[in-house]
């Protein structure tokens, strides 16, 4: 007697595989309606729990369930395998027979009468064994249309029958590359996309149906499963039509060129009018007596072995995944409840709306206080534009540098002073500088810079307006219906403050024209230092005509003096003195302008945050002449209403899912 060769794959470390008893063992499981009795009574509660979660559509919450996904190329014999497992007839014909995901729930029953029904589109349609194929076709036409197209909307088939294995499988359309008989041009893309969606999750077990008549390495279903399961840890292969291509089959399943870690099961398809019991008997006879097929290890042949393996794999996967599923359900439920609680309550009265508005403005005020006054930007750690005290300091520093930058000399040295003195002369003692002359040249200096402070203050308030808009938008995010009103109110407030600030800045600048005064001792120190070279300068201009045309003056560098030799000393002396006075005093003026603007800015910002913001925004929002912002809060925006409904539906689904798994988790604790 020839000793059989073993063609069994080594078991996956994570999923146990059952061994069938020897063919010589008299106690081998009897062949019932289609196959065998259930693995044990623990499978059914686990499977019912997962099926309950599947019916609840918990997958739409991003929670993947342990699923046996049946895939195969067109005409691979996929339908025959499922028929043999369930003991029922599925739609047959040319082209794609399965056009929607068919969720097959097989449940062992002690009743002699089978119960079969379909579920789709929230409907339950009872049927029987004789009419099941017809009922599936009719349901498929409702879901996917009466043509040849496919749909990803599932159809659930319940089979409660004596002798069936406790299994839930998802049968997907067979893979076809070339559209025929009115199929859509992108039929391959539609089917492959549907298959990838089901087999990609790590919780999916891939039942890959392969025909013994083809080279496994060329099968499209193998190529697709290897994309998501490169090592084959989640893939079990069923080799159909073993009786049609027995030669080389042993080598195929032994060599395992396509890396199927969960192993192979070789089966014989039901032929013609055979009953399922006759088909199983013929299958057992084939693998026991065929000169080639009998060499294949008995642990990997036959529909009963396939059913047993699938049940064990399924129960192991469910037991392994259930704690993770429970954890994900709890996590997503907590997140959904938290998100729902963050949404604004539905306003029932103007009083409630006003209170909500005060909360929005109050929280915005606190944010503005932190970022504009206290320098606390913890609320916006990564948004440097919202680090307001730093940005205001930057703008003030840039303004100071720009204001105090040394202007380019247009007139020749002392010529402006000489012209002013000439125009301001009067009958009186010589060598006295008329105050009017000093104020005249001071006014010229002020006129030269008067636009810069106004530009600076406008820039400051434009920036603060952007900040205020960002803060109020964030705080009123749950009330989009009033965001435009709050933004307009904020813009109006900043516009008023900006106008007041510009007027104040213009006053500060104008004051510098009217009075030449400072108590800063630096003025006298600087003037004394600069005038110390006056005598040598006058001598160089008036007495020493042979010296070079340039003279070094402290604070001015080398200045041209040849153009001054036509003037008398009694004019040059006051001109030089006034030049040194205005230069020393002008530095004081510029610093004073910067200081005054800095102090005024700080005062204005604090006034905005502490007093004006809340008072004026609320006043404008409650004024019916401005659109009645408070009344708008009574109308929940479509966006928030949609978000609320979605969260409420998610919470309902997740709570039901939590209840569904609670009992089974308690039993397994």
Curated annotation (Swiss-Prot):
Residues 273 are annotated as: G5 motif. One of its GO terms (cellular component) is microtubule. Residues 575-669 form the GED domain. The keyword Lipoprotein does not apply. CDD domains: DLP_1 (cd08771). Residues 72-79 are annotated as: G1 motif. Keywords: Cytoplasm, Cytoskeleton, GTP-binding, Hydrolase, Microtubule, Motor protein, Nucleotide-binding. GTP binds at residues 72-79, 171-175, 240-243. This is Dynamin-related protein 4C. The gene is DRP4C.
